[in-house]
């Protein structure tokens, strides 16, 4: 069937900032999608349209984007009479309607809300679960793969008020036998970590950050890794749970060097690290700790250091700000051999079709693909269906804490239950899940 109405409204994300929610109506019902928003955003991302009216919502209103959906998109999309099952036709139509390279006219936040809501309508039209529809759109093979969750349990960088330069310290239960067991392991380590931090740094160090992780006031990144390993050991899961990091290095890149004390306005330039120094530091961490994945190790345009590190890294090297889920940036990264995995964030590119293409291009290049939330989230669970539909085998959507994070993990538990024996858990093969 076709779309009879497209309606958007302004809602609030998990940080209390306005964001866009879209509802698409067909004769099968009303289908809703909420759009997330990032804090550390790559300069190459599609444009999130904000009103910029300082006196309203501190400039963060999205009434322009909402208005674009309710007028231009609603009128044109209904008139176009496209089938909701044909996701590519709908997304191409939206891209042409916008007409800009980075979706700045209508706003990537407006377009993505429509794209995801249409995809949910398409699944209902076919009478299949959302993840099955996505698998069809991507041409995914069977069996379905349930992802290894990467729980961001210690927060630093732009997400936290501590001195830590690196943004995320994650645990990945690769040794679990199923997704539900991975949830059990992750939550137990999370609670153990809370105790460890409380004993060492006091009660207020266990306040949680934007993604549900803890932000103890530590300065040395290695201390973050120590805390993880201690908690894993105390919980009894050494060997079963690995460690991952998101350094978000673009945030501490200054004049060609890296400042690990970037939150201090008077940091000492003589302590800034070169790309080689930073590479050595990462390799020293990888030698001491069970690190399986490092994301955004260098600045988003520091291709040289990316490629140099990727040439010798035996762990997963994930591009996020580097690649911004953009097929053109991904092609450049493949050509330059800059990394070996993609972080997939639907709102960096703005349509489901382009997101699927980004995943397929990356998988074709032999890369891993990790599906990701943003730090400003909603209760929308689309990425749970996307990670299963695309068989990427890994997802990061925060700590096992805060309902906007658990919404995704809980949806994956439901999908696991529904699939039963028809699905496998990626486990230790998370980097090559698409080959399973």
UniProtKB/Swiss-Prot annotation:
EC main class here is lyase
Q: Where does Mg(2+) bind?
A: 246, 295, 320
Principal location class: cytoplasm
Entry superkingdom? Eukaryota
Catalyzed reaction equations: (2R)-2-phosphoglycerate = phosphoenolpyruvate + H2O
Q: Which Gene3D superfamilies has this protein been placed in?
A: Enolase-like C-terminal domain, Enolase-like, N-terminal domain
UniProt name for this protein: Enolase
Give the record's keywords alphabetically: Cytoplasm, Glycolysis, Lyase, Magnesium, Metal-binding
Cellular component, GO, one term: phosphopyruvate hydratase complex
Organism lineage reads as: Eukaryota, Fungi, Fungi incertae sedis, Mucoromycota, Mucoromycotina
What protein family is recorded? Belongs to the enolase family.
Q: In the record's cofactor note, how is the cofactor described as bound?
A: Mg(2+) is required for catalysis and for stabilizing the dimer.
Instruction: Give the intrachain disulfide bonds.
Output: none
